[in-house]
Regions:
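C-terminal lobe and pocket-closing loops
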Residues: 124, 210-278, 307-310
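Bacterial N-terminal signal peptides
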Residues: 9-20
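N-terminal (or domain-start) structured segment
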Residues: 25-114, 153, 177-206, 213, ...
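Short coil/turn segments
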Residues: 40-42, 96-97, 132-137, 158-163, ...
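Beta->alpha turn/N-cap motifs
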Residues: 93-98, 158, 188, 205-210, ...
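A ligand-binding cleft/hinge motif common to bilobed small-molecule-binding domains
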Residues: 97-107, 171-175, 202-236, 313
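Hinge/capping helix and adjacent helix->loop/strand transition within the periplasmic-binding protein
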Residues: 83-89, 103-190, 239, 252-285
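An extracytoplasmic/periplasmic, membrane-proximal ligand-sensing/linker region
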Residues: 30-32, 174, 241, 263-324
Length: 324
């Protein structure tokens, strides 16, 4: 097999960086790495984790697999990683808001901050307010008016308790005094199935999950949680345009491992993933999916995790998320 000149340079640079690391970090990885995902296959976390796994595997010449361990809104996978050996071979790809909300709602057996070693942000998600293609609502205002008239209010589907989609939708409905009932699914794909068939009135899926259904008319977009309008949906307004800037939620997704991972190992893993994020195919796929690549230092990510935990403890009370 012939290596490209660019890849040779990347491998050489990575090799030189290893010389300054302690032995455990220098030897990493010597066997396959597992990326744990707490939601069902086909959702934004799963899809993007698999894209990263492919890019990382190509960069380091070692197998990287994705394992879906669903349950408790991602809590089962998070608890599994928290209890894993801090050797870098079992890592978690997760939503910052959901990771904090599940324990804030009393539905988890892990420590959202102290139980994990932050590595780096991976990507941001953009979510879009969608209704079935045959819904009478063509704007957010019309949807909310329907909810006020409908017995029991709107039915709201989410990809999981504490997901950005869940928090965003609930905050907007409460701010606009719209009655609603929430159904939580184990990921974006099962939620989308019920949204398309009209079993739920609306949801806030990610662009990557919903774009094909928007294109063929099975779903209709009413609003977008993004800094600016998205080119493929030029007529869909942003939340800022609609007057809901204060209801926006954090939408970062990140990579973490068990607490106790040596700093040099954390640094090595971070460098591997940042180098992999420069893969042209990965960049192309994430751009198409409306999930821009982002990165951070472990310290920056740690502060963000703490901020999310502080925020979600308050939101759990405001949104009545606390479970027995």
């Amino acid at each position: 097999m012939t290596l490209t000149f660019t890849r040779c340079l990347a491998l050489a640079a990575l090799g030189l960086s290893l010389l300054a690391l302690p032995a455990p970090a220098q030897d990493f990885p010597s066997r396959p790495i597992t990326l744990m995902v707490g939601l069902a296959a086909g959702g934004i976390t799963d899809v993007t984790a698999r894209l990263y796994a492919e890019a990382v595997s190509k960069a380091i010449g070692q197998r990287v697999t994705v394992e879906n361990k669903t349950g408790a809104g991602g809590g089962v996978a998070a608890a599994h990683v928290q209890n894993a050996a801090p050797d870098g071979y079992t890592l978690l790809v997760f939503s910052g808001s959901q990771h904090a909300t599940v324990p804030a709602a009393g539905n988890a057996t892990y420590e959202p901050v102290k139980g994990f070693a932050p590595v780096t942000f991976l990507f941001n998600s953009v979510v879009v307010l969608t209704v079935p293609g045959d819904s009478p609502a063509r704007t957010m205002k019309e949807l909310h008016e329907l909810g006020r008239k409908k017995q029991g209010g709107l039915t709201f589907g989410t990809p999981g308790l504490g997901s950005p989609s869940h928090l965003l939708g609930a905050k907007i409905l409460l701010a606009d005094t719209v009655p609603f009932e929430t159904t939580h699914y184990r990921g974006g794909q099962p939620m989308m199935a019920d949204l398309i068939t009209g079993r739920v009135d609306f949801s806030w899926p990610t662009l990557s999950t919903s774009r094909s259904f928007l294109a063929d008319g099975k779903l209709r977009a009413l609003a977008l949680d993004a800094d600016a309008r998205w080119a493929p949906l030029p007529d869909v307004p942003t939340l800022v345009e609609l007057g809901f800037a204060n209801q926006r939620v954090a939408s970062w997704f990140a990579l973490g491992g068990p607490a106790g991972m040596p700093p040099a190992l954390v640094s090595k893993i971070r460098e591997i993933f940042i180098q992999a994020s420069k893969d042209p195919e990965l960049q192309k796929r994430l751009s198409e999916n409306g999930t821009p690549i982002v990165s951070s230092t472990p310290e920056e990510m740690g502060r963000a995790m703490q901020q999310e935990w502080d925020t979600m403890q308050v939101l759990a009370k405001t949104l009545n998320l606390r479970q027995p």
